[in-house]
């Protein structure tokens, strides 16, 4: 989700930078650091995923559950902590952001709910087949 946020909202739409309380240069640097961290996490996750495949230990239902739960947690953390509590940045500037905030956090809740639902189903299926 960090990659989607970084690419779409930071680079393509230019709505904000990760850290907007300073100069444009600092904002661009903060975007680069965020993108670097997100990319390192993605590569590490790919190695972990490949290791599960190699060991034939991948449980696809649990993997999808974790994927959507992670998307939702990231979205809500960004919307609540980064946008509202720390005020690192807002979704947009020079507009009423209320609708954007509701849409951003609602999307996070939907993703989180989907992840939790998939987790419950995966656990039930694992218990039934064990």
Enumerate the predicted regions with their spans.
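Membrane-helix exit/interface motif
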Residues: 11-17, 44-52
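Alpha-helical transmembrane segments of multi-pass membrane proteins
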Residues: 1-2, 70-78
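Interfacial segments of alpha-helical transmembrane regions
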Residues: 56-73
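"…centered on the first transmembrane helix and the immediately adjacent amphipathic helix/loop
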Residues: 2-36
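Residue-level detector of alpha-helix boundary/anchor positions
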Residues: 22, 66-69, 92
């Amino acid at each position: 989700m960090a990659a989607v946020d970084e690419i779409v909202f930071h680079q393509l739409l230019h709505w904000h930078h990760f850290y907007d309380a300073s100069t444009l240069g600092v904002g661009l640097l903060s975007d680069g650091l965020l993108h670097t961290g997100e990319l390192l996490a993605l590569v590490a996750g790919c190695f972990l995923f490949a290791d599960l495949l190699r060991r034939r230990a991948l449980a696809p239902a649990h993997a999808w559950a974790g994927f959507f739960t992670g998307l939702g947690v990231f979205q809500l953390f960004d919307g609540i902590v980064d946008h509202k509590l720390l005020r690192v940045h807002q979704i947009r500037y020079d507009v009423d952001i209320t609708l954007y905030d509701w849409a951003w956090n609602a999307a996070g809740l939907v993703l989180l709910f989907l992840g939790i639902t998939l987790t419950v189903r995966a656990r039930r299926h694992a218990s039934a087949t064990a």
